[in-house]
Amino acid sequence: MRILYLLLSVLFVVLQGVAGQPYFSSPIHACRYQRGVCIPGPCRWPYYRVGSCGSGLKSCCVRNRWA
């Protein structure tokens, strides 16, 4: 009977970990969610970098609001 309580507590821990997973399946989707575009290399004006896409060779760039 004790094993059931242990398994139930492990199940709750696993479910809490799954609930904390990000919704986005890839960095490209996360970049699009921020209204950004993936550009190879550094961001150029009027864009600025907010992150990276994939392997880090591409930058997630967002257009500057004041340009």
Curated annotation (Swiss-Prot):
Key word Disulfide bond present: yes
InterPro entries the record matches: Defensin_beta-like
Disulfide bonds: 31-60, 38-53, 43-61
Localization annotation: Secreted; Cytoplasmic granule
Signal peptide bounds: 1-19
GO BP term, example: cell chemotaxis
Keywords: Antibiotic, Antimicrobial, Defensin, Disulfide bond, Secreted, Signal
Expression (tissue specificity): Expressed in bone marrow, testis, ovary, lung and trachea. Expressed in the ovarian stroma, but not in the ovarian follicles.
Propeptide part(s) removed at maturation, as residue ranges: 20-25
A GO term, aspect molecular function: CCR6 chemokine receptor binding
Keyword Chaperone recorded: no
Function: Has bactericidal activity. Potent activity against S.typhimurium and S.entiriditis.
Protein family membership: Belongs to the beta-defensin family.
Name listed for the protein in its UniProt record: Gallinacin-6
